[in-house]
Amino acid sequence: MSSDVSPPPLLSAEAAAQLATAPPVFTTDQILEILPHRYPFLLVDRVVEYQPGQRAVGLKNVTFNEPFFQGHFPNRPIMPGVLIVEAMAQLGGIVLTKLPDVAGRLALFAGIDGVRFRRPVLPGDQLLLSANLLTIRQKRIGKMFCRAQVGGQLVTEGELMFSLVD
């Protein structure tokens, strides 16, 4: 990580399982009020942990009915890595746009650093997403450390940058 902030530890399979059944902090309907994304591009089903101005943990249930599985790949469906990154970015967007100083602004992707893919995401997997705010500058640029896990196993992690626009 290029920041001085250490990434949080990976969640154990047991902790991930507990979060999978935790009551939502933000439901799908509430997420729709926060994010501009809509089906088929809304990639956060619910937020199960939220610390204002710091971090969020969310879930994406990956089903065989996802539109991207039709072509990625026939007879061997794998969730595209760019959509895993997008899911992490959407969760990061929730953390940023809920900040009092930036309420009502739109968080746009501005950069990706150090993203690595560790294992494929398959139909039936539940992505456990985490987004941790590292920095925000001039109420215009935010940097997050984001991670995706399945069953306690690391799938993807990296730093995402956002530009906040009116």
From Swiss-Prot:
Protein purpose: Involved in unsaturated fatty acids biosynthesis. Catalyzes the dehydration of short chain beta-hydroxyacyl-ACPs and long chain saturated and unsaturated beta-hydroxyacyl-ACPs.
NCBIfam families xrefs: fabZ (TIGR01750), PRK00006.1 (NF000582)
GO biological process: fatty acid biosynthetic process; lipid A biosynthetic process
Annotated protein name in UniProt: 3-hydroxyacyl-[acyl-carrier-protein] dehydratase FabZ
Principal location listed in the UniProt entry: cytoplasm
One of the record's GO cellular component terms: cytoplasm
Active-site residues annotated for this sequence: H72
Protein's organism: Synechococcus sp. (strain JA-3-3Ab)
The keyword Transport is assigned to this record: no
Pfam families: FabA (PF07977)
